[in-house]
Swiss-Prot record:
Membership in a protein family: Belongs to the RapZ-like family.
InterPro entries membership: P-loop_NTPase, RapZ-like, RapZ-like_N, RapZ_C
Transmembrane helix in keyword set: no
Record-annotated disulphide pairs: none
Protein species of origin: Bacillus velezensis (strain DSM 23117 / BGSC 10A6 / LMG 26770 / FZB42)
Function as written in the Swiss-Prot or TrEMBL entry: Displays ATPase and GTPase activities.
Positions with a binding annotation for ATP: G16, M17, S18, G19, A20, G21, K22, T23
Keyword Nucleotide-binding: yes
Residues bound to GTP: D67, L68, R69, G70
GO-annotated molecular function: ATP binding; GTP binding
NCBIfam families reported for this sequence: PRK05416.1
Pfam families: PapZ_C, RapZ-like_N
Sorted UniProt keywords: ATP-binding, GTP-binding, Nucleotide-binding
Annotated protein name in UniProt: Nucleotide-binding protein RBAM_031990
Amino acid sequence: MSMNENHDIQLVIITGMSGAGKTVAIQSFEDLGYFCVDNLPPSLLPKFLELMKESSSKMSKVALVMDLRGREFFDRLIEALDEMAENPWITPRILFLDAKDSILVTRYKETRRSHPLAATGLPLEGIALERQLLEELKGRSQLIYDTSDMKPRDLREKIVAHFATNQGETFTVNVMSFGFKYGLPIDADLVFDVRFLPNPFYIESMRPLTGKDEEVSSYVMKWNETQKFIEKLVDLLGFMLPSYKREGKSQLVIAIGCTGGQHRSVTLAEYLADYFKKDFYTHVTHRDIEKRSRK
C-alpha cells in the first residue's frame, strides 16, 4: 500500500484579522490532538507538509496559524494554496476569523498592543490595510467565524463542536439565533426574519425569560403563523441542505432573527437544530441571549 493511501493530511489554516482570536483557536486545535504550528512562513508550507507526510509519526491532523505582515507574505500564501490544491493527499481548509472594527480596536486597547500593520500606531489604519490584504483569502475560506460577540470560551466551543467530529466529510449545520437590534451576523449563509410572529416580550411574565424556557417556547409555537412558517421553512431547508452537502460545503450557518434575540428566534433556532439533527450534525448558538434585560 502506498504512502498516499496511508497518510493523508487534514490541514486547517487559521488566519484572519489580527485580534480576532487566532491564539485561542490554535490552543483549541491542540486540545483536539492536532499538530500545531504558529506563524509558519508561507514559503515553507509545501516543504513542511512533505516532511509531515514522510514523518514516521504519521501526523494526519495539522493546524497552522498564518498571520500576514505585508503584500509579499500574502502573495506567497496564495501561491502555496494553489500548489496544495494539486496534491491529492492534502485536504486543506481555511478557517478565517473576523470581528467588527470597533471590537478589534477595543481588544487592542485592552491588551495595549499595536496593530502589526499600523505604521503610525493607530489601530484603525492597520485594520483597514489588513482587511484589504485579506479580501481574496477570505473569499477562499471554507469557514468564517465572526468573533465580535464571542468570549474565548465561545470560540473554543464552536471549534470543538465542528472539528471534533468533522474529519473532512461531515457536513455541519450551525443554527444561530440573533437580535436585529444588535446587527446581522456576518458569518451567516442564510438569514430568516421571524419578527412577524407574536412577541412574548409584551407579556410581562415572559419578558425576563428566553425561548429556551418552556413557557415562552409553547407560546411562540402555538400560533398558526408559526406552524405554517415552520412547515414551509423545513421543506425549503430539507431541499437545500443536501444540495449544499453535495457541493462539498463543510458547514452552513442558518441565522434566525427577531428583535432582541431572546424569545422568538431562540425558540425557532432550538426547533430547527433538533429537527435536522437526525440527518445532519447540528450545533445551535444564541448570539444575543445574554444581552436580555431582566427589569
